[in-house]
Design a protein with these regions (language model features):
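Cofactor-pocket helix-loop regions in the catalytic cores of large enzyme subunits
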Residues: 1-190
Length: 190
């Protein structure tokens, strides 16, 4: 802390407090995460950006998926039957969420980890899929293909809450598990 404080003081003395640009991450998109240091940075007089650097994209995706750009309440995961952790080492980087996942698991939820890296989270999964790096989209397309082909989609819900499902179904029609397996390095059974 002394080293950081000394460096801050040197920068402020030489260039002004605006020369310090804090980087902020929203973590699991919670307001607590994104606003944690606001009072300190304001008091210091540091430069500020609105939101996190990736916030606009994450917020738009969350709003489209969940109906709100603020993310979902992580405690709702305890009611899940299936939790898919895709490209995230949750046990290491989102430690406050892992106990909620364990609670869901104790209630019967299955945890699938999809990640090109074998992480501590992957080691804890009920099922670990390790696609080749950069092949996530092929796997996603094949998963959608199977959901539609095997009539695992709630058509009534889709009709009431989505737009363009028919276009999506047409787009994924050629993304068979065999095609995805060739791209991802996974087996067709996976």
């Amino acid at each position: 802390l002394t080293e950081i404080a000394t460096r801050f003081r040197t920068i402020i003395d030489q260039h002004g407090a605006e020369a310090i640009m804090p980087y902020v991450s929203a973590g699991n998109q919670s307001l607590l995460s994104i606003m944690f240091g606001d009072r300190f940075w304001h008091h210091l007089g540091a430069s500020r950006v609105t939101g996190a650097l990736c916030g606009a994209t994450a917020g738009a995706g969350a709003a489209t998926t969940n109906g709100t750009g603020k993310g979902i309440d992580p405690s709702d995961l305890v009611h899940s039957k299936l939790i898919i952790l895709w490209g995230t080492n949750t046990r290491l980087t989102n430690r406050h969420l892992w106990p909620v996942i364990e609670e869901a698991r104790a209630a019967g939820a299955q945890v699938i980890v999809i990640d090109p890296l074998r992480t501590i989270t992957a080691e804890s999964a009920d099922w670990f899929l390790q696609p080749l790096p950069g092949t996530d989209v092929a796997l996603m397309l094949a998963m959608m293909h199977v959901l539609i082909r095997d009539d695992l989609v709630d058509q009534e819900w889709v009709a009431a809450h989505t737009v363009g499902f028919e276009d999506l179904a047409a787009h994924v029609a050629d993304w068979t598990p065999a095609r995805a397996a060739a791209a991802t390095g996974l087996s067709v059974a996976d």
